[in-house]
């Protein structure tokens, strides 16, 4: 939570500063945390032994059917012994329950909740007396701690006195409240890798200096990984102990097939990233300018499936630039394109086996370390906005596409790893 607060302060994200209760006596805090919201479902619901927290990321197959990007194979493997709790309103994806159906508990805090709240207050007191953080940093950190306890109390009340043994979810960061609830209830929590993990990742690869502190960190009991490459990345850090890094293989909805490389076109695939329209739109506009010298080349922009500012990208549309449908398959375009362009993205790894050359726009600020690490590993070729990428591509002496085998990135799906306690 301290890391969240410091990052928000660095980004100056004003909307992340909340009104908190930590300045009040703890007895008053306990009363305020009883301000509940009535649930729209009864309290006597039953969960299966396994629970999947569906984040709402969808994949569209060739027939236009929607599938859970991360949960489709998991649910098929666990079959009737798994309940789905949806975290997003996606009518296309079936679920047993939606998080919106559960209100906020109005019952008095029990002994475990009081203990957690007391621990948080001790942490807050230590932070304020330590003199290490600025007033604004403290405001962000207090907000992060408030959100943590809100999440903890909600999921603790949802999962308490149920028969749940294992909970599957994506992204441990910003979900520490869920992890804490599972720890208190002795529920095994298992993270599914949901995208790019980088050696410079702020949440996945911590330096040795943090080793002692990480012993008390709220981390999942296991993380399921796509393949051995990702395990080797986590091995650089010190938060994942032996036995917690499990190679589950390609549990994504998409099945990898041998691409038809005869379909290759003079096409540049731009894979955007969520919430980065302020960078991608001008970068793509500069790319379009360079293509005036290459009229036989075209651009297709594949937006992140969770992109909210879709309309902003429409200004790019013309005869040389297409915007792909939001939930279309990235692999359909990798089969056709010769060049992929982004900043830092999992799609660079998806390009393995597709005879695609990856280029990464060099930027400043958050994310620059990620991109430089990909360049150091030979996964991307760094370029600047405005560079003539087609000419650079045409001047390459050797194909850069086979940086890693598909098997190292996405191993064969192993259902047994998801069934073992």
Regions found by a protein language model. Give the residues of each.
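Catalytic-core helical/loop segments in enzymes performing group transfer/polymerization on anionic/lipid-linked
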Residues: 1-421
